[in-house]
Amino acid sequence: MSRIGKRPITVPAKVQVTIDGTKVVVKGPKGELSRELPVNVSVSQEGETLQVTRRDETRTSRQLHGLSRTLVANMVEGVSQGFQRRLEIQGVGYRAQVQGRNLILNMGYSHQVQIEPPDGIQFAVENNTNVIVSGYDKEIVGNTAAKIRAVRPPEPYKGKGIRYAGEVVRRKAGKTGKGGKK
């Protein structure tokens, strides 16, 4: 039995779960998410808990059991509390700002980079160098944060660029010259 898959999911009071065959719909104060689960797993609701079970013991079912449980748990957590991803901008002259709903990045290019948020995603900027991506769908929050980071990933020599909060960038030593010009 999958150690992750057999753990029950606690549903908060303000969250409503509807199960229709393989489709799971979760509604909460932050929004509504729905997902079609594989036919190898089934979800049952007992009071304030959800239980994900697999139909048989095939290898595919065992693989999808823990995944499906985690996906449903992320849906429940997303509509009740939401998710956020923090990014840090390092480098002279590199900064971010929010204009309307869009994120404007000045990253040393000849133009500003404008990022439009998908539905359900909000941007916030602190001190022009910290970007917060928040929303109720964990997958979309992570993908949006990855797109922002891809605008200027941290480089290994000076560490300039956009990185996730707490990300450690491996640094490289620069060239060791022979002495320089005289």
UniProtKB/Swiss-Prot annotation:
Belongs to the universal ribosomal protein uL6 family. It comes from Trichormus variabilis (strain ATCC 29413 / PCC 7937) (Anabaena variabilis). Keywords: Ribonucleoprotein, Ribosomal protein, RNA-binding, rRNA-binding. The gene is rplF. GO terms for molecular function: rRNA binding; structural constituent of ribosome. PANTHER family: 60S/50S RIBOSOMAL PROTEIN L6/L9, LARGE RIBOSOMAL SUBUNIT PROTEIN UL6M. This protein binds to the 23S rRNA, and is important in its secondary structure. It is located near the subunit interface in the base of the L7/L12 stalk, and near the tRNA binding site of the peptidyltransferase center. This is Large ribosomal subunit protein uL6. It holds the Pfam family Ribosomal_L6. Part of the 50S ribosomal subunit. One of its GO terms (cellular component) is cytosolic large ribosomal subunit. GO terms for biological process: cytoplasmic translation. It comes from the Bacteria. SUPFAM superfamilies: Ribosomal protein L6 (SSF56053). The keyword rRNA-binding applies.
